[in-house]
Amino acid sequence: MIALIQRVTRASVTVEDEVTGEIGPGLLVLLGVEKEDDEQKANRLCERVLGYRIFSDADGKMNLNVQQAGGSVLVVSQFTLAADTERGMRPSFSGGAAPDRAQALYEYFVERCRQQAIDTQTGRFAADMQVELVNDGPVTFWLQV
């Protein structure tokens, strides 16, 4: 399971002219689900994403996680993160989970975030989405479990 996380000052996702999720300061999480992923991996990745200390403390050091910083989380499904790009000029998506399994794990991940008392907004699974963000820093990390 893969999360591309970005520290943002704001972010939103729109589907068919409807804003489905919008946050102020916090994390934009682009989430990719791979074939071998399961709930255990989703738990580990959620723990890492929410615990990752990429927000500045009073001394300006990256030392706070999203909850300590008072931020929110916007989770957007992104199957292209599971692509194999090592060969050729066209990505292969054979490493991605089947759509029904990917959706179940995406929803599980979102629910785990919400259980941690963090404001968690979402896109719409498998929809054509427009994502807007202001990357703060920029600060972007690739987390994989």
Curated annotation (Swiss-Prot):
Reaction catalysis annotation: glycyl-tRNA(Ala) + H2O = tRNA(Ala) + glycine + H(+); a D-aminoacyl-tRNA + H2O = a tRNA + a D-alpha-amino acid + H(+)
Subunit structure as annotated in this protein's UniProt entry: Homodimer.
Functional description taken from the UniProt entry: An aminoacyl-tRNA editing enzyme that deacylates mischarged D-aminoacyl-tRNAs. Also deacylates mischarged glycyl-tRNA(Ala), protecting cells against glycine mischarging by AlaRS. Acts via tRNA-based rather than protein-based catalysis; rejects L-amino acids rather than detecting D-amino acids in the active site. By recycling D-aminoacyl-tRNA to D-amino acids and free tRNA molecules, this enzyme counteracts the toxicity associated with the formation of D-aminoacyl-tRNA entities in vivo and helps enforce protein L-homochirality.
Molecular function terms, GO-annotated: D-tyrosyl-tRNA(Tyr) deacylase activity; Gly-tRNA(Ala) deacylase activity; Ser(Gly)-tRNA(Ala) hydrolase activity; tRNA binding
TM regions (residue ranges): none
Source domain of life: Bacteria
Pfam families, per database record: Tyr_Deacylase
KW tRNA-binding (keyword) present: yes
Species annotation: Salmonella enteritidis PT4 (strain P125109)
Keywords: Cytoplasm, Hydrolase, RNA-binding, tRNA-binding
Protein name: D-aminoacyl-tRNA deacylase
GO cellular component: cytoplasm
GO biological process: D-amino acid catabolic process
Class of enzymatic activity (EC top level): hydrolase
InterPro entries: Daa-tRNA_deacyls_DTD, DTD-like_sf
